Amino acid sequence: MKILFDSSILVPALVPAHPRHELCYPYLKAAKEQQTTAYVSTHSLAEVYSVITRLPVKPRPTPTQAQTLLTDLLTYVVAVSLEKADYTNAIDQMASLNLPGSGIFDALIAQAALKAEVNCLLTLNPDDFTRLAPELASLTNTP
């Protein structure tokens, strides 16, 4: 199975002190053990770094620890880069649905899922994706 991980899964999976770690970690572990083929949007890499270095948990990962976590992640997760056309598609999609603001970042992650032709977009925030397109609704899953 090909799974694209949303940052809402990666953050708790990577940080043992996160309250949802036990829920999310098994999916990342399966990817690390090559039981699934895992993908991440390159946008999500920056988002994960930003979030885990500001998490209100103890111990909070330092920037160096966050870098190490992401470097390790990229040894077993495929990063999906977007091109100009992918960004244009995401913007067009948002405009056609009359959706403002930060939802564009979900649209970019959705574009990465479609580009990688995954079977599953794994997220803790399914409504952020199911509202974008019918084909995403069928791909979007929660743990």
Q: What is the role of each PLM region?
A:
Residues K2, A107-P143:
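Acidic, PIN/NYN-like endoribonuclease modules and their adjacent C-terminal/linker elements
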Residues T62, T71-Y87, N98, F129-P143:
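Short acidic, glycine/proline-enriched helix-loop-strand junctions
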Residues V78-L124:
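Active-site neighborhoods of divalent-metal-dependent phosphate/nucleic-acid chemistry enzymes
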